[in-house]
């Protein structure tokens, strides 16, 4: 998986490493500046995930739990009368598999973060197939209210897309306590799904309290670690 899905490839390799080194940590990173040579564009970004193995003594509560990304090839499905399009079948299988890899049911999914965009030549096909899939797979899911379209806001983010959406999924699961589906829609022949599971204790956003990262430019770039077990207090959006 490359292009906007490159981060999923890096993340899968990182999770593979932790499977064989459960007491260690690994970094997964993606970045891109698709508008280069223009600079200071909102679609240039970098995300670094510091992942801990299940037996790593971090002395911190997890922000969230990540399942493996799952991808399915549309060519592996048949186009038949009375059946949904092959892309929808591939999405259905990928989402079910991704949920299982996160030890969840697909019906547990409470939010969607995706990269279908709204100006790309394939945006309509991306959105249509994903929306059709979730409408059938999760009948109570409100696609408009329960989703965030990253590239509709920032523009095409290139190789910086996948892990940016995973990071947003971590934040949503952490604060709202619901599993999040991260969908990689850019390859219409091979959709990618990943489920982020929430921690045991969610930390709801308190709108009446300060948000640490809004205090200044330097604070915005500080790492967001899991809350230390010995932390005397909790700052929204930050832990030492």
Regions found by a protein language model. Give the residues of each.
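Conserved beta-ketoacyl condensing-enzyme motif
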Residues: 1-2, 98-130, 137-138
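Conserved catalytic cysteine-centered active-site region
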Residues: 1-22, 27-29, 129-164
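Short acidic, S/G/P-rich loop/turn micro-motifs used as interaction or catalytic elements
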Residues: 5-10, 33-38, 86, 117-122, ...
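Well-ordered, non-membrane alpha-helical segments in soluble/globular domains
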Residues: 11-12, 84-98, 122-134, 163-167
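Cysteine-clustered segments with highest specificity for TGF-beta superfamily mature ligands
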Residues: 25-29, 178-183
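Condensing-enzyme catalytic core mediating Claisen C-C bond formation in acyl metabolism
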Residues: 34, 38-97, 197-240
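Membrane-proximal bilayer-interacting regions
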Residues: 156-162, 169-170, 174-182, 188-189
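A contiguous, mid-protein "functional segment" used to position or interact
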Residues: 182-206
């Amino acid at each position: 998986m490359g292009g906007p899905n490159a981060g999923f490839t890096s993340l899968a390799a990182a999770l593979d490493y932790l499977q064989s080194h459960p007491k260690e940590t690994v970094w997964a990173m993606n970045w891109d500046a698709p508008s280069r040579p223009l600079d200071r564009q909102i679609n240039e970004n970098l995300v670094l995930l510091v992942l801990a193995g299940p037996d790593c003594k971090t002395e911190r509560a997890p922000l969230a739990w990540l399942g493996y990304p799952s991808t399915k090839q549309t060519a592996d499905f048949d186009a038949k009368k009375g059946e949904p399009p092959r892309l929808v079948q591939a999405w259905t299988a990928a989402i079910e598999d991704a949920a299982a890899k996160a030890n969840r049911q697909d019906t547990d999914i409470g939010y969607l973060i995706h990269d279908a965009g709204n100006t790309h030549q394939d945006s309509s096909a991306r959105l249509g197939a994903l929306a059709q899939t979730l409408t059938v797979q999760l009948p109570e899911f409100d696609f408009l209210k329960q989703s965030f379209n990253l590239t509709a806001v920032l523009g095409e983010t290139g190789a910086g897309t996948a892990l940016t959406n995973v990071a947003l999924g971590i934040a949503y699961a952490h604060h709202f306590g619901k599993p999040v589906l991260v969908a990689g829609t850019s390859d219409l022949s091979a959709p990618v799904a990943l489920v982020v599971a929430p921690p045991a204790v969610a930390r709801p956003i308190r709108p009446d309290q300060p948000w640490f990262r809004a205090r200044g430019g330097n604070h915005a770039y500080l790492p967001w670690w899991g809350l230390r077990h010995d932390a005397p207090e909790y700052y929204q959006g930050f832990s030492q």
